[in-house]
Amino acid sequence: SSMYRNLTITALLMALAIMIPIVMPLKVVIPPASYTLASHVPIFLAMFLSRKMAACVVIGSTLGFFVAGFPLVIVMRAASHMIFALMGAYYIKRHPAVLTGGLSFTAFNIVCGIIHAIGEVLACLLFYTTTSMPNIDLVYVVFVLVGGGTIIHSIVDGYIALYIYKAIPGLNPNEHIAGR
């Protein structure tokens, strides 16, 4: 049944989201900045299918970064993905044709990257205004490394996810996911 299929897809994407920060060899960590290749791909795939699925996968991803031993500020950044994931899933629900690719997906992906970066920058600012400040150039590290890096990283992962999404037959955000 479709309920079991949806549950299985959600569980698989959550498992990927948990495992990527733990086992991915291609990662750069300079707190509060971190770049783990493909870490957003399960979130994007879930976002393409359902808001509920996206929310579950963000929780899994956040857990993965926590279990992998990343600094708390990076775990908070992972939790901030809930914002762009839910907003993106909501938009896709209303405009599923964006997943056909082309300029509409490019615009969607850039906007998601900007929203994603704003969420991560806010998570860093919240963290550093409520804890002791490290000896860093806050403007450069938070706005350039985290903000700018997140936009680029998000866009790359968005395209990877779209490529995977298109390669899997039978995935359609309007047909197989009930209760979006």
Language model segments and positions:
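Loop-helix junctions at membrane interfaces
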Residues: S1-R180
